[in-house]
Structures are given as C-alpha cells and as structure tokens.
Swiss-Prot record:
Name assigned to this protein: Glutamine synthetase
Subcellular compartments: Cytoplasm
Keyword DNA damage among record annotations: no
EC numbers, comma separated: 6.3.1.2
Enzyme class label: ligase
Subcellular location, principal: cytoplasm
Species per Swiss-Prot/TrEMBL record: Vitis sp.
UniProt GO cellular component terms: cytoplasm
C-alpha cells in the first residue's frame, strides 16, 4: 500500500480532490519530467508495488 507523506493526502478525506489535480501537481515539477516516468505522465495511476 501507499505510505509516507507523499501519499498521505490521497488517502485522507478529500483525497480524490488531490487526484483530480494530478496534471497541476506534475506541472509543478518543471519541464522534462516525461523522460523520467515509467508510465504516461498525463494519466493518474496507482497500484501496490513490490520493490
């Protein structure tokens, strides 16, 4: 499951509001981020990871 301060807003009440602003949040990181992503940067995705 998601954990830590980065994922906390999405898990709390109003979390869907955070998800709806995904593109706005990505834009805050600056230019060139699409080169570093492993999935489409314009689509919000989530899943359980096993690292």
């Amino acid at each position: 499951t998601l954990s830590g301060p980065v994922s906390d807003p999405a898990k709390n009440d109003g979390g869907f509001e955070v998800i709806k602003k995904h593109k706005e949040h990505i834009a805050a990181y600056g230019e060139g981020n699409e080169r570093h992503e492993t999935a489409d940067i314009n689509t919000f995705l989530w899943g359980v990871a096993n690292r």
